Amino acid sequence: MPQMLTDLERVITLETPSQDHDAVAAGARDLAALIEERVGTAPEVLEIDGVTHLRLRFGSGPVKVVLLNHQDTVWPHGTLERLPFSVADGILRGPGSFDMLTGTIMSIHATAMLLEQAGDSSALDGLTILITGDEELGSTTSSQLIRDEAAGARAVYVMEASAAGSLKLARKGTSDYEVTVHGKAAHAGLEPEKGVNAGLELARLMPLIAEMADDEKGTTVVPTTITAGTTPNTVPAKATVHVDVRARLTSEQERIDSEMRAVKAEMPGAEVEVTGGINRPPFERDAAAHLFDRAVELAGEIGIAEPTGTAVGGASDGNFTAGDGIPTLDGLGAVGDGAHAEHEHAIISEIPPRTALLAALIADQLAD
């Protein structure tokens, strides 16, 4: 455990905000060196559209197990000055400690445990560790890498954290849209009748968009950020709203996508432009069921508390693999709280048993 805490301090104090590709690249290089120190093999450093990711494959045969991690965080440079890395009273704190650097270090140490037990890296043939650099931005450069690497795998284990320790058996899919109304500017005092008020038309559309939601099916459609106009005395020629969509079911996600693209203007002279679309497909419960059952069995075998399962609204990279029909179990990382919040922390006593469970899950799926 002391080595894990040392490694966590090392990665947390790097600062890897998602938007800073250079910082993410530097963090990836340091993490690659750490991986080589712990498991004796350096991962590949992959750059996709300017974003750096790491991939460590064991063996040359088919991929059987994929560990999904990310090393980018939502925290800007300088956060450590306010929220420094600390270990006190059984709590680990620092930016990214919960989401999800603890899970990433757990992946590395679970792999090291298995190597030490086997004494030979061939025991891990079929294992891939992925550590991406843009998860907090929607995985725009890494989603295809994830899907390609996991294709045909027996299991994908996602090292995202869990506030209550429950493993994630289902997650909502996410879609993001930008609805822009194009109108015509005019002087608001001299000749407003010559304008086409994009703000008014957007105000008419937003309740209609929100009504696409279906509470019974768990589908949420939420207009969020809104912009309109340029100056207080000008009829707005352009107005835009961002729409956040979450859906438990693929059919619902597709329904919303169809309805969003059918949005039309009614105000004469106004036009509507809808951009964006589906980002992550729903992670439906069937994808995790047998892996969760096996996790419960293995927990009993190694003498730790049986995990519980839950469904959540937030998405992860596991949505991509679950959406492709690959068995996927999520939430295997840190136990704590405060994702994207200043009280972010991980409970230290939970790290060793969950690392042991991860090692058991990996070995179980690698066994022929």
Predicted region positions:
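Acidic/His- and Gly-rich active-site-bordering loop/insert found
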Residues: 1-95, 116-121
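Metal-dependent amide/peptide-bond hydrolase catalytic core
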Residues: 16, 75, 161-162, 166-169, ...
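Glycine/serine-rich anion-binding loops at beta->alpha junctions
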Residues: 75, 91-106, 187, 317
